[in-house]
Amino acid sequence: MLEAYRKHVEERAAQGVVPQPLNAEQTAGLVELLKNPPAGEEEFLLDLITNRVPPGVDEAAYVKAGFLSAIVKGEATSPLIDKQRAAELLGTMQGGYNIATLVELLDDAELANTAAEQLKHTLLMFDAFHDVAERAKKGNAAAKSVLQSWADGEWFKAKPEVPEKLTLTVFKVPGETNTDDLSPAPDAWSRPDIPLHALAMLKMARDGIEPVQPGSVGPLKQIEAVKAKGFPVAYVGDVVGTGSSRKSATNSVLWFFGDDIPFVPNKRAGGFCFGTKIAPIFYNTMEDAGALPIEFDCTNLAMGDVIDVYPYEGKVVRHDSGEVVTTFELKTPVLLDEVRAGGRIPLIVGRGLTEKARAELGLGASDLFRKPEAPADSGKGFTLAQKMVGRACGLPEGQGVRPGTYCEPKMTTVGSQDTTGPMTRDELKDLACLGFSADLVMQSFCHTAAYPKPIDVKTHHTLPDFIMTRGGVSLRPGDGIIHSWLNRMLLPDTVGTGGDSHTRFPIGISFPAGSGLVAFAAATGVMPLDMPESVLVRFKGKLQPGITLRDLVHAIPYYAIQQGLLTVEKKGKKNIFSGRILEIEGLNDLTVEQAFELSDASAERSAAGCTIKLPEQAIAEYLKSNITLLRWMIGEGYGDPRTLERRAQAMEAWLAKPELLEADKDAEYAAVIEIDLADVKEPVLCAPNDPDDARLLSSVQGRKIDEVFIGSCMTNIGHFRAAGKLLDKVKGGIPTRLWLAPPTKMDAHQLTEEGYYGIYGKAGARMEMPGCSLCMGNQARVQTGSTVVSTSTRNFPNRLGDATDVFLASAELAAVSSILGKLPTVEEYMAYAKDIDSMAADVYRYLSFDQIAEFREAAANAKIPVVQA
């Protein structure tokens, strides 16, 4: 075991990274060596068992906890670890497999006090809390001391407070850094391996950044240079963390600039992140990891500056001169407690443990922790989002949660996908989660199914069982995109989250998050939320000929720019949507599938979430279809069948008594943007390479196009029919490389049945497996330096391909561009659009599974499990 491990250490050192944590097999080998240690290896073996085994309910932690438990019970021995030391080591494992033994040791005369000391600083107790409380009631002195310690918050008091002054060195990245810069999509396979993945951070050369190996290894020399000044380093930018929700972006920043977590291998916490604007999901992920994220004007900071930050006073000064650079206000005073506790999640869990212990002991509420400042009640009405969150928090019907209020809404639906799923699995293990508390947790395999690496194949084989044994639902590789499936599992007016920034429910509301917070939501069934303000977008009038929903998606940033509420320039960036909820009304004849195109794109606005006012009939039709789909899934052997049936029954219950929340007429919004559909007379695109840079077709027409992509969660079956109708009229091939990727296998099947795949083949299109395809850029990519029209979600630099120029546009405009080999004039486009408009009723039909015999019969014949009410 040691020989193989040392070889691994050498291989990793050659890559410039630390060794991976021990797996279960290696830990089992280590256990045998600890029982009979080779001479001279004693210290090394002790270090491995102490510091290189993951905590929680990891498989290796199971082996470690089993061995240490056997020692304290006298069932095993090691000359290096006595009973006392074994109990202490159990106390370093955070929670999960170590807890039962530590609680039992409270009855052991020899080790009770040692076990008590460990439990006093263990937060992940869950149901084992009651085992300690029962012992305390029966007079167990050690258990009493544990309960009292929890009640007094000793776990929190033992940690140092945030200092009055922080002296830091600036690592400045000018302009906008999105999460793809920090955690590049082509390197997604390595995300769970934090040290290895971190090497790719900022690997593309840009202003002020010099990668060691452009395209593969980031600016390690610059990082070492700022560290050499001897102070902790702050990551600083103009706009930081836009784009995907990936926690791997935070992990990479903290790997270089954070602090080691005692007894936890290959993971760091703490650190500092400052930005003129910090995207909301990235901000929350930093919070969860124990970092100190602060928004202030960073214009006058440069790479290598040494600054003094005064977190309580709210000012930044130059270390040498004392010159005030800028001032700031913390988003919430609770942030300082979060940093002290090691993160927002440890604070929430620990605070809950303290409250529980105080209630058990008959004590009043603790005044140890900072409380969020409750906003003044304006007495005005509530928005739709505020009412949805209010219901999820158990408030009286019709009551909402005011912006600025801290709350913990119930998570009804949680989604996870395959490039974040392995990290979510690790986080769930760290949280000692063996069963989900959220009502429905779904895992997809849409980002890696098409062109899997060996590590992806391993994930495809192992992650489904991990999810299903905890009561979750697992899709299969090739099924299609997470959102296209998860949307069909939603309940109206409920709240959820997902480990993908495009988890934007078209019914209800979701607050997408990084994998740590997603794991917390899945495990506990709630999620911490500082309720954001809302921005209302109100459409009026009638949709003009040739104008698509995607044009309305892009009209939102276009109109915001015209009104001075959004700027494309990164310095002094203005974005009215950032961190707020986008609420949309006025499009009263949308289907739910169409509504998702609008809610989905709220991610590109950096909005915290989105709601859309939809008619009751549209939602009822959608749920009827989805009940059939869920029972078809049960018949097809998808699991967990009880979770699927429970959700189907909840949909039936809503249909039996349909009702929808509505915004009050006097609800308050941070801004109201009115868009008259009569004024949107030509297609609106987003120009390279910024989803905020919305432009009219007439301003960019004529640009030569090399490649076209029609796919992503922004598309549905109607878009592929529209493209097919246009392509069918082409004689011979097309002058562009055309990629087509339907969102689900059901769409692909239906399009095949209707003959569209034959049309695509005749046109020379490259057909991709249902799923994300080019959109994330982690597998197949467009040609370097090409100009592309894409229906995908984002057009950040280097996302679809290296050095590409990408226009975001509707499927209809994308299809026309593929035929012409250029962006058409408005007149050219309208000539094609006229044909589509004349066939709209046939083209824009959506999948109603309750009306498709194959699905209806399979659902009727499925073996439905009994579900407890």
Curated annotation (Swiss-Prot):
One of its GO terms (molecular function) is mRNA 3'-UTR binding. [4Fe-4S] cluster binds at residues 713, 772, 775. It comes from the Bacteria. It catalyses: citrate = D-threo-isocitrate; (2S,3R)-3-hydroxybutane-1,2,3-tricarboxylate = 2-methyl-cis-aconitate + H2O. Monomer. Involved in the catabolism of short chain fatty acids (SCFA) via the tricarboxylic acid (TCA)(acetyl degradation route) and probably via the 2-methylcitrate cycle I (propionate degradation route). Catalyzes the reversible isomerization of citrate to isocitrate via cis-aconitate. Catalyzes the hydration of 2-methyl-cis-aconitate to yield (2R,3S)-2-methylisocitrate. The apo form of AcnB functions as a RNA-binding regulatory protein. This is Aconitate hydratase B. It comes from Pseudomonas aeruginosa (strain ATCC 15692 / DSM 22644 / CIP 104116 / JCM 14847 / LMG 12228 / 1C / PRS 101 / PAO1).
